Amino acid sequence: MQNINQIKLTWISFFSYAFTGALIVITGMIMGDIADYFNLSVSEMSNIFTFLNAGILISIFLNSWLIDLISIKKQLIFGFLFSIIAILGIVFSTSILLFSINIFILGLVSGITMSIGTFIITCLYSGEKRGSQLLLTDSFFSMSGMIFPIISAYLLDRKILWYWIYVFLGIIYFLIFILTVKSHFPVSEEKTKNNNEIKNLNINIILLSISALLYILGQLSFISWVPQYTTEIININIKKTGVLVSNFWMAYMIGMWCFSFIIKFFNLQRMFIFLTGSSSVLMYCFIYSKSYLALKYTIISLGFFSSAIYTIIITLASLETKKPSAKLINLILFFGTIGTLLTFIITSPIVAKKGLYTTLIFSNVLYVIVFFLSCIIFKNSKKKDHC
């Protein structure tokens, strides 16, 4: 019976990441259709991402304290109710202001749900198995990011209005709701008491938080500007450029599945050093490659070897305390989300003043910094073990 409950809780975590992945991808995919619906330009619609990301960031930050006041089960039930309200609000939105408010609410729901999903996994599993399960959980983010564009394209091709895509998105949260009602959450009462342990921040937690921010910033800065770089600098046509980006994310998802098995047999800190080092070298090779074939195989390798880095950062942070801490997990997610928000704020001026080539080098430098941080974290842990 306990095993069945654990399976239900694990699937809640899987679906929580699937919900966030789908939400982010579909909002970008139907940007043009939303702009036409509200008679705005695509550039004017770009603030939607700000509302969505702001909602995710704020909710992750607030959930560090909210989890002490409201049980996980109640939060997920309220999340389902708010998701229904937001989706109905989107369907019946008559102005861009109402749409922005509702997308912000979905961002709040998404951030809280994703942080809960991560916390559940860290409570249910320990050691290398925790890292393995977190990788599987993270793969659902990429999986829904691949499935929902197909659903979106199918609906739009049949002239079905764009807002029905959000209705399909609601199905994921409905599944979370069903599993929540039928599950017992022992972690919600006992484990959240360990949140005070974050007050005793050690240097590794700080370094892991910085690593999360720099890694996400480096990754998104790289992959966001690769299409423009390959078309303008390398002179590759847009179709082949699209294949490069697709190959990266496909390899990223496959990598998460593979490393969820491989990670059980290796030391997490050594794996962290190996993956950040390999990814830094591969990104360097990509930047200095000129042929399409070299770019293709390099970006596939980069997607594969970088896939487990963020999850390993979360896992290592969760192992810094004797028992899982929701505040600690949310701290890493919070820094990762800041990296997402800073992507275009930092890279757009670099592109404007120094060009695309310099922007990719900037991304590579961030990866190298994370590699050095991983070495410092390993060294600190060895000292801690000897004490």
Curated annotation (Swiss-Prot):
SUPFAM superfamilies: MFS general substrate transporter. It is a multi-pass membrane protein. It is found in: Cell membrane. One of its GO terms (molecular function) is transmembrane transporter activity. InterPro entries: MFS, MFS_dom, MFS_trans_sf, MFS_TsgA, MFS_TsgA-like. It comes from the Bacteria. It holds the Pfam family MFS_1. The chain crosses the membrane at residues 11-31, 47-67, 76-96, 101-121, 134-154, 160-180, 205-225, 243-263, 271-291, 299-319, 331-351, 358-378. GO terms for cellular component: plasma membrane. Keywords: Cell membrane, Membrane, Transmembrane, Transmembrane helix. Signal peptide: none annotated. Belongs to the major facilitator superfamily. TsgA family. This is Protein TsgA homolog. It comes from Buchnera aphidicola subsp. Schizaphis graminum (strain Sg). The lineage of its organism: Bacteria, Pseudomonadati, Pseudomonadota, Gammaproteobacteria, Enterobacterales.
